[in-house]
Swiss-Prot record:
GO terms for cellular component: cytosolic small ribosomal subunit. GO terms for biological process: translation. Pfam families: KH_2 (PF07650), Ribosomal_S3_C (PF00189). PROSITE patterns: KH_TYPE_2 (PS50823), RIBOSOMAL_S3 (PS00548). Keywords: Ribonucleoprotein, Ribosomal protein, RNA-binding, rRNA-binding. This is Small ribosomal subunit protein uS3. Residues 39-107 form the KH type-2 domain.
């Protein structure tokens, strides 16, 4: 089952945290969930070239706190904070609530699966060979300190008549190990032959349990 399920969702509550942190009753839950989706689509659409990895949302009363994780914080903030202020105003109008935006910088973009996937997708759109794009991405990620990476592209590769999927990997990616810090990201490339899907798994090492389990391990 570990081969099929989303590796991030499988680890939520174990070593990963939720991207949306709020509570709502049955009456409001669906509306707030759709609002979260609209916020993420708006942010990702507006900051398409800013290497945005994820958008975290927290709610308190009539206030929405949004944390944008990006490899290019300067592009998100803009000159004198103009871009982030324009984004905040547009989100205020979209939600009808007070919106506060935090920017979190991603120090190593090559270890972020979403950004690696987007990088490959952009190269495919620029007619670079999918094999070359994947192998270069693998080299950069392993050089950045990853323990393993698995890549997959699927669609009409190289303009072929029949769609297929191709995989490349290096190192280990233990999908069944819950303490393994595995990042997963997807992207789509719009080519002249149609869409090509990109999936990336990056294994960044094990996250050790934080609660006192050493005694139990020593006892065994």
């Amino acid at each position: 089952m570990g081969q099929k399920v989303n590796p991030v969702g499988l680890r939520v509550g174990v070593i990963r945290d939720w991207d949306s942190k709020w509570y709502a009753g049955k009456k409001d839950y669906a509306d707030l969930l759709h609002e979260d989706i609209a916020i993420r689509e708006h942010v990702e659409g507006r900051l398409k070239d800013a290497s945005v990895s994820k958008v975290e949302i927290e709610r308190a009363a009539n206030r929405v706190n949004i944390t944008i994780s990006t490899a290019k914080p300067g592009m998100v903030i803009g000159k004198g904070g103009s871009e982030v202020e324009a984004l905040r105003k547009s989100l205020n109008e979209l939600t009808g609530k007070r919106v506060h935006i935090n920017i979190s910088e991603i120090k190593q973009a090559d270890l972020d699966a979403k950004l690696v996937a987007e990088n490959i997708a952009r190269q495919l759109e620029n007619r670079i060979s999918f094999r070359r794009a994947m192998k270069q991405a693998i080299q950069r990620t392993m050089r950045a300190g990853a323990k393993g990476i698995k890549t997959q592209v699927s669609g009409r590769l190289g303009g072929a008549d029949i769609a297929r999927a191709e995989h490349y990997s290096e190192g280990t990616v233990p999908l069944h190990t819950l303490r393994a810090d595995i990042d997963y990201g997807t992207a789509e490339a719009d080519t002249t032959y149609g869409k090509i899907g990109v999936k990336i798994w990056v294994y960044r090492g094990e996250v050790l349990p934080t609660k006192g389990t050493n005694k139990e391990e020593g006892g065994n």
